[in-house]
Regions:
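Membrane-proximal intracellular helices of multi-pass ion channels
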Residues: 2-369
Length: 369
């Protein structure tokens, strides 16, 4: 689920491969995996399962039957994995490394077989990985649109535009802040783009030591940990579409204060966002930050500062993997007690299942029937 360190960085090759496979299965979602291979999938239950893993506020049916949708998603997922493996092999990367990197990149899990992550490899492997991290930060429904030649839907995607603007904007600010540290413009563009996409996709590979970046850069990257990539991607975080709806909802609240008699509707991709969806997004945001605060308090009992505790909570909830040590931005958990580790593990599951499907298990109403 999350790229974390501190439980031992040296494993046998079998363990490394198994870890990458679990990354890969979890990337698209265990529920979608089961739905894809289930012999029978009822429409009501299958739609709930698909929304649990691809819950974006505007989650739409790719094709009429949910089981067919899940199979289509996995066909795209598998194809992207195979293509990346082939490209890495063509670049001279060993087969074992290519397979593990590809499984962890397409799933945005971020596990690597080398302790210093992608910094162990050359620019070619990093650039290939950058491309696939970017693709897997996008909604898989866009890939379906490409296959169906529905390019108008892609052009109308406000979330895709926001994703491009955020990535390029943060990369530009990072480049300005660290311009004097790089030997060339090309080197600076490469590392800043790689780090921005790595964080917003919640993959969390590194192409350069994390301590290289300034506190200002890490402040921006922490915000990206929270927002995450597009809805319907394999990444974690709140998702950009939710953030966009939250911003529009806040603006509407201000507008209603100024002009209370006016009708203010929230639009996304040219469509009106239903009030139930807006309410669900607002509830998700409240639940997310309540979990961050609760985790930070628990970790403070373990001796961590509130800042480090909140960073660890955000990292776990967003399935990123950076966080506990604010000086090195690595997530070392070996020094934490069992309660703190359990809370972080719960946060990882909570974030991976988009909070509410996990909380449903603990709701009294669930067990009354």
């Amino acid at each position: 689920l999350v790229r974390s360190r501190g439980l031992g960085d040296v494993y046998k090759r079998q363990i490394l491969l198994w870890r990458s496979i679990t990354n890969w299965i979890g990337g698209m979602g265990v529920l979608v995996f089961l739905l894809a291979i289930a012999p029978v999938a009822r429409e009501g239950g299958s739609m709930f399962l698909l929304r649990a893993e691809f819950p974006g506020p505007m989650a739409a049916k790719l094709v009429p039957r949910m089981q067919k949708s899940a199979k289509l998603l996995y066909e795209i997922y598998i194809a992207m994995t195979v293509v990346q493996i082939v490209l890495l092999l063509l670049g001279g990367i060993p087969l074992f490394d290519s397979v593990n990197i590809s499984l962890s990149t397409v799933s945005t899990g971020g596990f690597c077989v080398r302790n210093d992550s992608m910094a162990s490899y050359g620019a070619y492997a990093q650039n290939v990985t950058l491309v696939f991290m970017t693709l897997c930060s996008m909604s898989f429904s866009l890939f379906y649109c490409v296959l169906a030649l529905e390019f108008l839907r892609i052009r109308r995607s406000r979330e895709l535009r926001a994703f491009v603007v955020v990535v390029l904007g943060v990369a530009l600010l990072m480049g300005i802040d660290t311009a004097s540290k790089f030997t060339s413009v090309a080197d600076g563009v490469h590392h800043t783009l790689f780090q921005v996409v790595s964080i917003i996709s919640t993959t969390c590979y590194v192409s350069i030591d994390a301590s290289f970046w300034s506190p200002f850069v890490w402040a921006m990257l922490t915000v990206l940990m929270i927002t995450g990539p597009m809805s319907g991607s394999t990444g974690g975080g709140m998702k950009l579409s939710r953030v966009m709806i939250l911003c529009k909802s806040t603006y509407r609240a201000i507008a209603r204060t100024v002009t209370p008699n006016s009708v203010h509707l929230i639009h996304l991709d040219g469509e009106i966002v239903e009030e139930d969806t807006v309410s669900a997004v607002e509830s998700f945001a409240v639940a997310y930050f309540m979990a961050v605060i609760f985790t930070a308090v628990v970790l403070s009992i373990n001796g961590l500062s509130i800042g480090d505790g909140m960073l660890a909570a955000i990292s776990s909830l967003s399935n990123v993997g950076y966080g506990i040590d604010s000086n090195t931005f690595t997530m070392g958990v070996s020094g934490l007690n069992i309660i703190s580790k359990a809370v972080l593990c719960f946060d990882m599951f909570l974030g991976r299942l988009e909070i509410f499907p996990m909380l449903v298990l603990f709701a009294p109403e669930t067990w009354r029937k």
